[in-house]
């Protein structure tokens, strides 16, 4: 058992010994299926604290010849597979954590030589008569061993992208590292000695121009995870079971930590869910996982529409995004779509693959983004929030004229000329205008099923604020009148479906005159 060749199973044992362990060994069924095939080159990227290292340690514990793990995996999902014992501890495994290797290597520029030297040294102990003295190329060493003995290797690289993310300015180090990976995995010779390759990190494989630097790898990411989607985070079923055990309300857990849509799965942040179950408090557990310094410089980049897109998403809207141009690094940003795509990979945004839109997935992330912008003084958002807070105050005080003026101002500022006279744009403007309401209200519900129809917007106060803030039913009209809007709310009995959510209920009618581009607003109160 070595440090890098055939490690033991101690690291995975720590995960199994923890109070909460959610069984993800079903992934091994897939890796067993694709090993020694063209599909056996996997890059699985996901955000921090989404279980990347636990997965890498699980693969090592299952495949490595350096340990005996039958008892460890008994009772877990993989133990019920027909080929469970066929692959159990049967392979020579190379496992490197690039982040950890940085310190003993003496710096990023020494990573490739350090990994090569240490791994070759361990290979010589296992295969003493095959490797000649002075050999320095790890790919060559693996090739020689395969030629002499027929041995094939499973290679697992944790934090594979740390040099791409953290050493973006050091092009020489990056180039050396990418060339090392190419030599390890790409071409005819590596197919002879690679049984399975599994890379995990935050970013998918680096692109060069539009082509992946390792185009034989299959990228599974927060954009698309294919067959391994249920193993990216906690699934809804897994979270429901934890809620039953720990007595948590599932709907509240869903509001705080759900939102990542990967294939047919709703995926939850494992770190947040585990901390909630153990500590019992709904809050953001994200702060320790990423730096505020990384967020605001990204959204402050001078790209058309970037800042307004972020404000739209903070208000609950989805924004279109083209994820195809991102180069999978932290420097080659060409437009707002590249920035949004990077934020998706970081976990600050989620991606709707069907409609090709980005959005803020849940309450935890919304709070983190707002907190980050406050700490780093993103002035545009700070000013906008103050305006939004005044709008909410005017709404609650039933000052219809002030509300109309503020919505008109935002309508002009955040809607393009082409979209200005468009009912959908007015709906988006309303979401943006009431951004500050997110402190006290759930995300506004569009087309809320109520009475004999669907209310345009409903704002329901969070439980802790229901005695202080009224529920809001908002109806939008186009070239009609505010009276028509309020009459529709009453005639279709919308209030009856909403009144139970708060002590008071405000009916808000808003009309937009397409010809004059003026807005009107009237507000009425209903007491329960």
Enumerate the predicted regions with their spans:
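Conserved catalytic cores of phosphodiester-cleaving nucleases, focusing on short active-site segments
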Residues: 430, 455-461, 469-480, 492
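Phosphate-binding site recognition
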Residues: 1-422, 437-441, 445
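Domain-level recognition of nuclease-like catalytic cores that cleave nucleotide substrates
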Residues: 497, 501-528
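Structural motif
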Residues: 154, 470-474, 506
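Mg2+/Mn2+-dependent nuclease catalytic core
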Residues: 174-180, 478-495
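Extended hydrophobic-aromatic, low-complexity segments
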Residues: 352, 441-446, 465-471, 482-485, ...
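Metal-dependent nuclease catalytic cores in nucleic-acid-processing enzymes
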Residues: 184-191, 341-349, 431-436, 488-508
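Catalytic centers of nucleases
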Residues: 444-464
């Amino acid at each position: 058992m070595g440090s890098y060749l055939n490690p033991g199973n101690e690291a995975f044992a720590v995960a199994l010994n923890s109070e909460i362990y959610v069984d993800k060994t079903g992934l091994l069924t897939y890796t067993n299926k694709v090993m020694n095939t063209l599909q056996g080159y996997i890059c699985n990227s996901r955000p921090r604290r989404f279980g990347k290292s636990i997965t890498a340690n699980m693969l090592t514990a299952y495949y490595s010849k350096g340990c005996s793990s039958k008892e460890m995996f008994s009772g877990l999902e993989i133990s019920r597979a027909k080929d469970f014992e066929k692959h159990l501890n049967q392979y020579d495994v190379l496992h490197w954590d690039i982040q950890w290797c940085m310190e003993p290597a003496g710096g990023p520029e020494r990573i490739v030589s350090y990994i090569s030297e240490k791994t070759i040294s361990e290979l010589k102990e296992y295969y003493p008569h095959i490797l000649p003295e002075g050999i320095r190329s790890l790919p060559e060493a693996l090739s020689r061993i395969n030629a002499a003995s027929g041995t094939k290797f499973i290679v697992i690289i944790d934090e594979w992208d740390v040099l791409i993310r953290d050493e973006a300015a050091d092009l020489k180090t990056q180039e050396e590292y990418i060339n090392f990976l190419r030599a390890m995995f790409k071409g005819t010779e590596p197919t002879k000695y690679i049984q399975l390759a599994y890379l995990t990190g935050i970013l998918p494989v680096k692109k060069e121009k539009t082509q992946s630097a390792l185009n034989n790898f299959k990228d599974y990411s927060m954009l698309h995870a294919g067959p391994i989607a249920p193993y990216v985070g906690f699934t809804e079923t897994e979270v429901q079971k934890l809620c039953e055990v720990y007595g948590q309300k599932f709907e509240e857990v869903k509001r705080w930590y759900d939102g990542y849509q990967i294939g047919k799965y709703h995926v939850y942040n494992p770190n947040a869910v585990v901390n909630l179950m153990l500590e019992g408090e709904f809050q953001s557990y994200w702060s320790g996982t990423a730096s505020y310094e990384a967020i605001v410089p990204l959204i402050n980049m001078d790209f058309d529409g970037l800042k307004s897109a972020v404000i739209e998403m903070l208000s609950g809207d989805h924004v279109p995004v083209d994820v195809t141009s991102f180069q999978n690094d932290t420097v080659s940003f060409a437009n707002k779509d590249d920035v949004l795509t990077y934020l998706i990979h970081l976990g600050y945004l989620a991606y709707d693959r069907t409609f090709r839109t980005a959005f803020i997935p849940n309450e935890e992330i919304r709070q983190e983004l707002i907190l980050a912008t406050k700490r780093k003084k993103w002035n545009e958002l700070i000013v906008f929030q103050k305006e939004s807070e005044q709008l909410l105050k005017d709404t609650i005080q039933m000052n219809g004229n002030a509300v109309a003026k503020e919505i008109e101002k935002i309508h002009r500022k955040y809607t393009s000329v082409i979209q200005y006279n468009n009912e959908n744009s007015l709906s988006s403007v309303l979401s943006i205008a009431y951004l500050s309401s997110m402190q006290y209200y759930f995300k506004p519900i569009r087309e809320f099923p109520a009475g004999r129809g669907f209310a345009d917007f409903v704002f329901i106060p969070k439980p802790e604020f229901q005695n202080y803030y009224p529920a809001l039913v908002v109806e939008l009209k186009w070239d009609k009148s505010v009276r028509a809007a309020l009459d529709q709310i009453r005639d279709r009995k919308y209030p009856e479906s909403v009144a139970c959510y708060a002590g008071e209920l405000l009916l808000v009618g808003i009309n937009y005159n397409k010809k004059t581009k003026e807005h009107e607003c009237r507000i009425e109160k209903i007491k329960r």
